[in-house]
Amino acid sequence: MFSFNESDLGIDVLHTPQQHAEFIKEFGEYLAKLNLPTKMLLGDNSDATTFDFILPAMKDNSTHKYIGAISFHSWRGCDDATLAKWGEAAKQLNVPLIIGEGSTDAAAHRYAEIFNESTFALYEINLYTRICAICQPLSILQWQLTSDYSLLWGDGIYRSQGPLRPTQRFWNMKQLASTPEEALSIPVTSSKKNINAAAFGNIARGEYAIHLVNNGADCNATITGLPKDIQTATVFITNTKDSMTQSTATVKDGK
């Protein structure tokens, strides 16, 4: 896949929406003439709110055969309606949606202590859960799995002391990434506004995952609509005290 990173913003190539469409068409045709399989990435936007940047290419049918995926970066977050637009765009072109840079605050490295705070971890996993539920991306590429924007702390990372150790963000990512392979998104709703949910399932293998993010006080949760043949569920809890702490829940009559 080929793209100029965040060309809606100009880092470091600046396109207008129409120029972006023309580039996809002309460079895509050039690659095709060279018999290269490389496809073009539509968007790769600096955040989700600049959705209109991809509209000229969406409306120009001659660009579609060169587009391999649609992408936006999740910086700064956005509302549910905007996320839904990206999901619908991917469905319209029948290509995957990729979150090309995943996290919430591109400037956070300037005040890096925030990476070790639970509030930052909660905001980030909330956004990822909403993205998974609403626009169903093929992949969220975490920015980034290095010492920069690190999911780890200690050993001098941003001058932090002590041994290298995982932060709450690490366990959030690990828990989300534990979704079964080749699982498809399943519709899920929550009766409480302060709980975000996303569900996945691989029906052929009988593997399912339900991710819940609680933004309120401790509470009991009842999940309904599970397959009738499931008798137990493995539960993982991550918060300021628990790091994917595992337990087993009994399932009866699909709940």
Task: Describe these PLM feature segments.
Residues 1-3, 39-42, 68-72, 96-101, ...:
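Structural recognition of the beta-strand scaffold that forms the well-ordered cores
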Residues 29, 33, 37-41, 62-110:
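Glycoside hydrolase catalytic-domain groove-lining segments
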Residues 1-57, 79-90:
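Active-site cleft segment of glycoside hydrolase catalytic domains centered on the general acid/base Glu
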Residues 48-62, 120-131:
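Short, acidic/polar
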Residues 96-175, 180, 185-195:
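Aromatic/acidic polysaccharide-binding cleft in carbohydrate-active enzymes
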Residues 227-255:
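Acidic, Ser/Thr/Pro-rich beta/coil linker or hinge segments at domain junctions
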Residues 189-231:
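Carbohydrate-binding surface patches
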Residues 4-10, 45-49, 74-78, 102-107, ...:
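Solvent-exposed loop/turn segments at secondary-structure junctions
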